[in-house]
Amino acid sequence: MSPERERFLAITAESLYLANLLLAPGLGFLGLLWLWRRPDVPALPLARQHLRQTLVASLWAGVLLVGLSATILLIGGFESMWSWLAVILYFTFFHSTLVLCGMVGLSRAMAGQPFRFPLIGPRDRE
């Protein structure tokens, strides 16, 4: 398989990650799962690495954004303005950070280089 095809799949994985965060939550993740099921991806190390990173980062993003925001609201109460302030600040900070990491991952995929998400990205087994 050509390096261009491998780079294209890596770029697609990073683009779907960003689409999951910015444009179509859920649909982008389904696209990542569909891409993971493709038979040609395991043979392509760069595409496999980017796809694995984006899948794990998407799962962490769901836990960090939805799970912890809901926990803050449940603990603080839905009527408390301080709970909403905390949720808005928390969500804005983490969402921006995840998008920024996705942009760096996309630029690395476009350059044909590997990328690991800081803190939440899995380490390569190879």
Task: Please report, for each region that a protein language model flagged, where it lies by residue.
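Membrane-interface extramembranous regions at the lipid-water interface
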Residues: M1-L23, L27-A57, M103-E126
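Hydrophobic alpha-helical transmembrane segments in multi-pass membrane proteins
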Residues: L9-F29, V56-G102
